[in-house]
Curated annotation (Swiss-Prot):
InterPro entries the UniProt entry points to: FAD/NAD-bd_sf, GIDA_C_N, MnmG, MnmG-rel, MnmG-rel_CS, MnmG_C, MnmG_C_subdom, MnmG_C_subdom_sf
Binding site for FAD: G13, G14, G15, H16, A17, G18, V125, S180, Q370
Family, as annotated: Belongs to the MnmG family.
SUBUNIT field: Homodimer. Heterotetramer of two MnmE and two MnmG subunits.
Protein name (record): tRNA uridine 5-carboxymethylaminomethyl modification enzyme MnmG
Any one cellular-component term (Gene Ontology): cytosol
Keyword line: Cytoplasm, FAD, Flavoprotein, NAD, tRNA processing
Gene: mnmG
NCBIfam families, sorted: mnmG_gidA
UniProt cross-references to PANTHER family, sorted A to Z: GLUCOSE INHIBITED DIVISION PROTEIN A (PTHR11806), PROTEIN MTO1 HOMOLOG, MITOCHONDRIAL (PTHR11806:SF0)
Cofactor(s) named in the record: FAD
Pfam families hit by this protein: GIDA, GIDA_C_1st, SAM_GIDA_C
Organism listed in the record: Escherichia coli O157:H7
């Protein structure tokens, strides 16, 4: 039977991609349905209890700048907050927080249940309703059919998921959850390229069986960072430390002598694992010269005794896992409460997607999260938000939107996936962005909140706070530009005491702030330049904008040059065999990828600058050279 009411957008899956997709579509005023196999696991952290990190924290801030949920949820659930790369430049600084799993899940569910235009329904989805290459709905396990103008697939590792512990394996979406086999089979019938990937998780340890007294502690930062531009540290729950132990030669001997029982090394697992989050058996074999590896013991929550040993993800048999755990300092008597495992699952080639994350072959069908070959909660959340907002725009007969590489890490993520595809689980790093000086955590709102407002994602409260911040930045910069001190002035001695070279000519507040030894905090304690802004976010922007002004201007010039290529559109139906002068390799790659622009074509491996020149000349001759606004 059909459900009596139609929807604008259906989201299938309630993980980190699905929850952001559902919230985005509903915020934009579309009637949205979130279908999940279990309402109690909405926003579940399936692997490590943490949000953020290098590159990942940038994505969380961007999701927040567009009105998303993840940053707000972690501010309410984070039990240890740190700034990574704090001693380096602002472009690569990143926020990371340990999470209380239960508090995080509660924060996500509360937000979903209180979001207007959003209905949550518990049923596994087994089929899609596709008519004339357009998706028009979904069918659940009990045969109930829902109609919609757009469908977003955010099914994580559940598609034909297979869990491996040693040489034993069984079907599962993650430990304790069933896989989605009928939906996987249905998707394989569609004209989509499919592959297999693998990820893993470590065993969980009972904290009461660990001797923490012999281990080094790792505390969070003070003052505590916050993730959301709307957040503050008073929202954070109680803060707790993590602990550090190490593997040793005994650990490595145990692993080496049991490799024949590893599904990875025995050839049982076909899927490729994540390069930047390798299993402990991979680390021992790939880095044979290392006699130890650092392991972080991370609490899973304030009311849980479970400890997540970050760094020993494994699919070795349970008896070997016990030996590995007990070989490490402080863990000699440790007890495992959940075994580690590897999970293998279907993913779909993201090169078959438009930059909006809509399928090139099935109209109205969007893909987001691990189904696109990514790894990580943050990468999933960012894709979910993008897919959700574009599903909402499609259902409202509006053009899709995707950020450029120069606008957001989300733009880098989507362009990498849709242009290059991936053969291993894709993780975001700052090194993937060529314009990272512009794409900082601290300015995510300055880059994206105005766009979010135009798209209908940003509410009045966030918009008012954003405009107040902009005014504070502008007013303070004008104040510092127009406040001067001369070498002969009474205040010069006070200023000189903080400079490596004394004033030799008249200087404004901005001139002084450009000096490497001067900070905004120090400057605003000096008589001519006091008082400091009470708006800490605006104060941070003033300092960064002044200190890095020259570098930022240079990068802006580079972006404007590249924008010409990004805006030169390529016809979706163009058969590149018509273009004389292109090599067979280039023709094959362009026909395979079907890039949307010259910029995208130039990033395809094997497409040379000479080929781009030939293509531009041919387009001009044919009268097909078009540029977007």
């Amino acid at each position: 039977m059909f459900y009596p009411d139609p929807f604008d957008v259906i989201i299938i899956g309630g993980g980190h991609a699905g929850t952001e997709a559902a919230m985005a579509a509903a915020r934009m005023g579309q009637q949205t349905l979130l279908l999940t196999h279990n309402i109690d696991t909405l926003g579940q952290m399936s692997c490590n209890p943490a949000i953020g990190g290098i590159g990942k924290g940038h994505l969380v801030k961007e999701v927040d700048a567009l009105g998303g949920l993840m940053a707000k949820a972690i501010d309410q659930a984070g039990i240890q907050f740190r700034i990574l790369n704090a001693s380096k430049g602002p472009a690569v600084r990143a926020t990371r927080a340990q999470a209380d799993r239960v508090l995080y899940r509660q924060a996500v569910r509360t937000a979903l249940e209180n979001q207007p235009n959003l209905m949550i329904f518990q049923q596994a989805v087994e089929d899609l309703i596709v008519e004339n290459d357009r998706v028009v709905g979904a069918v659940t396990q009990m045969g109930l059919k829902f109609r919609a103008k757009a469908v977003v697939l955010t099914v994580g590792t559940f598609l034909d998921g297979k869990i491996h512990i040693g040489l034993d394996n069984y079907s599962g979406g993650r430990a304790g959850d069933p896989p989605s086999i009928p939906l996987s089979r249905r998707l394989r019938e569609l004209p989509l390229r499919v592959g297999r990937l693998k990820t893993g998780t470590p065993p969980r340890i009972d904290a009461r069986t660990i001797d923490f007294s012999v281990l080094a502690q790792q505390h969070g930062d003070n003052p505590m960072p916050v993730f959301s531009f709307m957040g503050n540290a008073s929202q954070h729950p109680q803060q707790v430390p993590c602990y550090i132990t190490h593997t040793n030669e005994k650990t490595h001997d145990v692993i080496r002598s049991n490799l024949d029982r590893s599904p990875m090394y025995a050839g049982v697992i076909e899927g490729v694992g994540p390069r930047y989050c390798p299993s402990i058996e991979d680390k021992v074999m790939r880095f044979a010269d290392r006699n130890q590896h650092q392991i972080f013991l991370e609490p899973e929550g304030l009311t849980s005794n479970e400890i997540y040993p970050n760094g020993i993800s494994t699919s070795l048999p349970f008896d070997v896992q016990m030996q590995i755990v007990r070989s490490m300092q402080g863990m000699e008597n440790a007890k495992i409460v959940r075994p580690g495992y590897a999970i293998e699952y279907d993913f779909f080639d993201p090169r078959d997607l438009k930059p909006t994350l809509e399928s090139k072959f099935i109209q109205g069908l969007f893909f987001a999260g691990q189904i696109n070959g990514t790894t990580g909660y943050e990468e999933a959340a960012a894709q979910g938000l993008l897919a959700g907002l574009n599903a909402a725009r499609l259902s409202d007969d509006k053009e899709g939107w995707a950020p450029a590489r120069s606008q957001a890490y989300l733009g880098v993520l989507v362009d990498d996936l849709c242009t290059l595809g991936t053969k291993e689980p894709y993780r975001m790093f700052t090194s993937r962005a060529e314009y990272r000086l512009m794409l900082r955590e601290d300015n995510a709102d300055l880059r994206l909140t105005e766009i979010g407002r135009e798209l209908g994602l940003v509410d009045d409260e966030r918009w008012a706070r954003f405009n107040e911040k902009l005014e504070n930045i502008e007013r303070e910069r004008q104040r510092l530009k127009s406040t001067w001190v001369t070498p002969s002035a009474e205040a010069a001695a006070e200023v000189n005491a903080h400079l490596t070279a004394p004033l030799s000519r008249e200087a404004s507040g901005e001139d002084l702030l450009r000096r490497p030894e001067m900070t905004y905090e120090k400057l605003t304690t000096l008589t001519p330049f006091a008082p400091a802004l009470t708006d800490e976010q605006a104060a941070e922007q003033v300092e960064i904008q002044v200190k890095y002004e020259g570098y930022i201007a240079r990068q802006q010039d580079e972006i404007e040059k590249q924008l010409r290529n990004e805006n030169t559109l390529l016809p979706a139906t163009l058969d590149y065999r018509q273009v004389s002068g292109l090599s067979n390799e280039v023709i094959a790659k362009l026909n395979d990828h079907k890039p949307a622009s010259i910029g995208q074509a130039s990033r395809i491996s094997g497409v040379t600058p000479a080929a781009i020149s030939i293509l531009l000349v041919w387009l001009k001759k044919q009268g097909m050279l078009r540029r977007s606004a």
